[in-house]
A protein has these predicted regions:
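Substrate-binding/catalytic cleft of secreted carbohydrate-active enzymes
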Residues: 1-97, 112-124, 150, 156-157, ...
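Conserved aromatic beta-strand anchor motif in extracellular beta-sandwich/beta-rich domains
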Residues: 144-148
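Surface beta-strand/loop "capping" patches
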Residues: 100-143, 165-172
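Short beta-strand segments within Ig-like beta-sandwich modules, predominantly Fibronectin type-III
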Residues: 153-165
Length: 173
């Protein structure tokens, strides 16, 4: 068996002239494009390398890296590269929180990086926000309540050993 590593994944460019891609999203375009980017990095409905696929690969596949973590000016093309999980000013996009939700929920005092349980509600509740509420979390259970006296919806993480550790949570309208 040969071990291998995917050097670059996630860019998903449709052509190399316009450089358009569902993974190239300016943070200023709003929450819906950023949700599309995060979903593409997490799990796609078509054959493509994504985080879920990396987790489903055999042990000989030791991982992979995104093309670039930050948006930046490229120099060779008039448009900036917008495929980062943070913008050029290091402000997080929604895909950043999707990746944070993949870390273990157990707090590790040995780490200097942010760690432990996390929940991020990826819905701005504007008139243009999706009706379904997307949540990124590494917790076993997440409860969502809209307004004080509203009904609570509860998500229980499935007990599976395949795929990404914490699937994207979608609370339906």
């Amino acid at each position: 068996n040969i071990s291998y590593f995917t050097r670059e994944w996630g860019d998903n460019v449709d052509d190399w002239n316009s450089h358009n891609s569902p993974s190239r999203v300016n943070r200023g375009w709003g929450e819906v494009p950023m949700l599309v980017q995060a979903q593409g990095y997490a799990k796609t409905d078509y054959p493509y390398t994504c985080y879920d696929v990396l987790y489903r690969n055999p042990r000989q596949h030791v991982g992979g890296c995104l093309w670039h973590s930050f948006d930046h000016q490229r120099g060779y093309h008039p448009d900036p590269f917008y495929g980062g999980i943070m913008d050029a000013f290091r402000q997080p996009k929604l895909s950043y929180y999707m990746f944070c939700s993949q870390r273990p929920a157990q707090k590790n005092p040995e780490l200097i990086a942010d760690n432990g349980p996390m929940v991020y509600i990826a819905n701005a509740m504007t008139p243009f926000s999706p009706k379904d509420v997307t949540v990124y979390s590494n917790c076993e259970e997440v409860r969502l309540t809209f307004c004080k006296d509203s009904q609570t919806q509860t998500y229980h993480k499935p007990q599976t050993k395949e795929g990404m550790p914490s699937p994207i949570i979608a609370f339906k309208d």
